[in-house]
Swiss-Prot record:
The gene is darP. Residues 1-16 have a biased composition (Acidic residues). The keyword Ion transport does not apply. Gene3D superfamilies: PSPTO4464-like domains (1.10.60.30). Transmembrane segments: none annotated. It is found in: Cytoplasm. The lineage of its organism: Bacteria, Pseudomonadati, Pseudomonadota, Betaproteobacteria, Nitrosomonadales. This is Dual-action ribosomal maturation protein DarP. Residues 1-29 are annotated as: Disordered. Keywords: Cytoplasm, Ribosome biogenesis, RNA-binding, rRNA-binding. Belongs to the DarP family. It comes from Thiobacillus denitrificans (strain ATCC 25259 / T1).
Length: 176
């Protein structure tokens, strides 16, 4: 048995010990790629057709979208993760982020249109404010729709004018 001499001058170089990322770090990276693959699987058809993917990955994602059995779905998602490790995920993530940004913007516009519709029906002065903001809107038609919507609400009729006001507001917001 060799004994270590405590008086010996041992040099410790911390750079020579580093073997790369830890096992846990590698697992986190693999899981992140699988999550990115899951986002691809959950994309609506129109967005999935527009996203640029390597052919093998596109086929694997398309197959995963058709699978309903849990164990097969899990295996296919792991396979997608394996394919993702062989490519650069940054462009795919950028495209997904762009889709999400568009969706968030569209949602915000729809919420704003809903708020305008509710304000217009509840408050007569809101019409003046709306027409100042969107002067190209047909004021006569909008006034008539507001009257009809109030009448429909009072009589518990289907909200036909209510929906039409929303369409008019959305068109005005897109034009302006």
């Amino acid at each position: 048995m060799r004994l270590i001499d405590p008086d010996a001058d041992l040099e410790f170089d911390p750079d020579s010990v580093y073997d790369g990322p830890s096992k846990s770090q590698k697992k986190r990276e693999v899981e992140a790629l699988q999550d990115l693959g899951n986002e691809l699987v959950k994309l609506p058809d129109a967005q999935f057709k527009r996203i640029e993917l390597p052919e093998e990955l596109r086929e694997a994602v398309a197959a995963c979208r058709k699978i309903t059995q849990n164990s097969a779905l899990r295996r296919q998602r792991q396979y997608i993760g394996k394919l993702m490790r062989g490519i650069d995920p940054a462009p795919i993530q950028a495209q997904l982020d762009a889709f999400k940004g568009v969706s968030a913007t569209e949602n915000a516009k729809l919420h704003q249109a809903e708020k305008w519709r509710d304000r217009l029906i509840a408050d007569n002065e809101a019409l003046t404010i709306f027409l100042d903001s969107y002067p190209e809107t047909d004021a006569t038609r909008l006034r008539q729709l507001i009257r009809n919507a109030r009448d429909e609400a009072a009589r518990n009729k289907p909200p036909k004018a209510f929906r039409e006001i929303f369409r008019v507001i959305r068109e005005a917001m897109q034009a302006g």
